[in-house]
Amino acid sequence: MKTFHIATAAVLAIAAVSPHAVAQSSQSSFGSSSRDSQSAAPSTSKSAKPKEPQLNVRDVYSCPTPDKVQRQAEWKVYNTSGLALTVYVADDAGNAYQVLERVGTPAKRAWAPKLQDGTYHLTCVFHNDSAVKSDDFTVTGSTITEAPKMVPITDREVAAVAIQQAAEQKKRVPELQKKAHALADATSKNRPTARAAYLDYLETYRSFDDSSEMWPGPDLEGYAEVEKLLWSKRPVKDAAKPARALADAVDKTARALETSHFAIPAPDYGLRTHEVMEEFERFDMRGERDFGAHALPTALRGNVTSTRLTLDAVRSLVEGRGLDTAPIYDQLDELDKIAGEFDEKYDTAFDKWSQKDRMRLQSAVARANELLAPVATMTVIRRMD
């Protein structure tokens, strides 16, 4: 039975967050095992391990119910629903246990969740669609006595966080307007002044979460053209027109936000806490957002601010479920430090940096994304109420 509608993100990361939090999921993709390819000759051993049951997810209207589990669950999840899938184990008290995430379609994955004796059900969470509950199944004879678990965060709780974050972000829009107009004014001056104003704008723009792309009002991507012109051999005044257009777009967006409401959709909120840094790793560090300024440290500072502000709003919620956020904030501080250090050291593209410094930044960003991953998971595994 379909129980409630959510628009969950397809890309989730899972990690063990505390002795009381959700246990780490099976991360390995399914592949044919040797026992699957053995001949059909009858076995002479009575203790031969049976083939894992297959849980078939055929559509978005039902979630398969496992047979009774003796000792240890070992399943193969086969998703042919047409949508990416996340599956987790839950009990009637509302606790979530273990998660199998990022099951594509069609795709087959092995899953061996560690569960103690008890009664459970599965919840299938479909990308941009529904969460569907299976019937109950039981586990008996398990050697596990304290399976890690988490009381799921509710939709109402996440929605409140999204509204709070949106209100705080809205207060900062006038700052973006100010920086945009300062940039437009600077294009009538010398190149160093105009470039400095651009970098100031860029850092402020990057300090907003990436859902700003969905704000009401015009597109705010015009900064790329300004950057190309200011770091070219063309006269500074050539950047005046796109800079004025950018300032006008920011003004129109500010007015639109005054008369309408926008907040990160609740099902996506946890993902947004680390999507900014993931996209920095995926795009900025590959040079795809370098339009001539070689301003990677500036972009990093803005992204760190964005991540902090998005995490601040949900911090008490995830800490209440057992997540220690102190290491996350420490790592963001480390990234800020690295950004300042490399801003002084480099004015070249990232691929021209020394290998040692590239690896240092790559490692620090990857660590931040690793630490942020449980926030996404904890806000998508939600009680169905």
Question: Regions from the language model: what does each represent?
Answer:
Residues P53, R71-W75:
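Structural beta-strand segments of beta-rich domains
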Residues A84-T86, G94-E101, P327:
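Surface-exposed loop/edge segments in extracytoplasmic proteins
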Residues V77-S81:
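Asparagine-centered strand-capping/turn motif at beta-strand->loop junctions
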Residues S32-Q38, P42-R58, V103-P148:
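Extracellular/periplasmic metallocenter environments
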Residues A21-S25:
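Boundary at the C-terminal end of the N-terminal hydrophobic targeting segment
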Residues K2-P19:
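Gram-negative bacterial Sec-dependent N-terminal signal peptides
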Residues S142-D385:
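Mature extracytoplasmic or organellar-lumen-exposed domains after removal of signal/transit peptides
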Residues V60-K68:
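Short beta-strand segments of immunoglobulin-like
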